[in-house]
Amino acid sequence: MYKTITHKTTEEHYINGVRVKPMLIDPLPTVVINERTMNFRMDNRSLWTRYSLGMINFSVALYGGIVNSDNVLENLKKAGQACGDYFVPYYGFNAAKKIGSLLIVIAINGSKVAEALKAKRDISAYETIWDKQINELATYLNELNPQHWPKDTLDEMFINLTALWTDDFRARLAEDFVADSIALDAIIKIAVSGIPNHVNKGYTSIADTISKGIIAQSPLTFAE
């Protein structure tokens, strides 16, 4: 069910069947390895935790028949905009608004996928919509920071995230708690924590790709 993106790479890494790229960003300069950059990166991880798991919270509310699932979706939209607001000091309000808006529409489409699966409807049309939304987001981020945010890498990361959301929806509907746990773990890794770069076999997360890219593009902003 995963969409394959072909790259000229010498090795591939997988997490629960999902292909991910090894870490691409070089170690940060010593001048910016400090408390400020650590807090900056941890703040972004918190934002992406709320966004990536907010989608799962929506499915829990929807499948559990909780009346306020619409409120959960509203919170998910706010989480998407908060991820966008993170860009304000470095790329301005318009860029932040656009990124937040794209993350919101990706989440809204995710809510439609969750609803379609519950109703046993085909989701291929929604997957096509996701592909277009992700392409627009990856293209825009790459324009802001071409050196540190390669479009194909971002494409792959977000496609994997949406695929893992779908995996978790299916697992919850089937009451397969093992598959649910595996999907949740993979979501956190692809969106938030990544895998440590042990002998170049780790991979970075969406959150760390974004924060390290900002730091690497504007290192003096973070120097103490």
Annotate each PLM feature.
Residues G80-S111:
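Mid-chain, structured segments of secreted extracytoplasmic proteins
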Residues N16-G17, L24-T30, N34-S69, L73-L76, ...:
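C-terminal amphipathic alpha-helix
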